[in-house]
Design a protein with these regions (language model features):
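Surface-exposed alpha-helical segments enriched in charged/polar residues
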Residues: 30-38
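Short aromatic-glycine-(Arg/Gly/Cys) micro-motifs in beta-strand/loop hairpins
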Residues: 1-19, 45-52
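A short, exposed loop/beta-hairpin motif centered on an aromatic-Gly-Thr core
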Residues: 15-31
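Intrinsically disordered/low-complexity terminal segments and short unstructured peptides
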Residues: 12, 19-22, 40-42, 73
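Short, mixed-charge low-complexity intrinsically disordered segments
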Residues: 37-87
Length: 87
């Protein structure tokens, strides 16, 4: 089976390390991104779409860009500060 498109995710963890994940399936890419967001593990996530057929073969197009994401510890501190009566 010949794939028509590819997604490449580039993300930076809170310790400053960059990682990548590539897939040919959009749903898998979105699922992976959602898992990273829900775990508060990344400070930055970018997703690039590549066409593998047609006029724009191999040219990346940024389809998702999130910067300045907070860590789980920061999220907990923010909730405790805003709603101290909850704890």
């Amino acid at each position: 089976m010949k794939h028509k498109e590819k997604y490449k995710m580039v993300f930076k963890t809170h310790d400053g390390e960059w990682h990548t994940h590539s897939t040919y399936d959009y749903k898998e890419c979105v699922g992976y991104k959602d898992k990273l967001l829900n775990a508060y593990t990344c400070s930055e996530i970018k997703i690039f779409h590549y066409e593998l057929v047609g006029l724009n073969i191999g040219q990346p197009r940024c389809v998702y860009n999130a910067e300045g994401l907070i860590s789980l510890e920061t999220a907990i501190e923010d909730v405790e500060r805003v709603s101290p009566h909850m704890f």
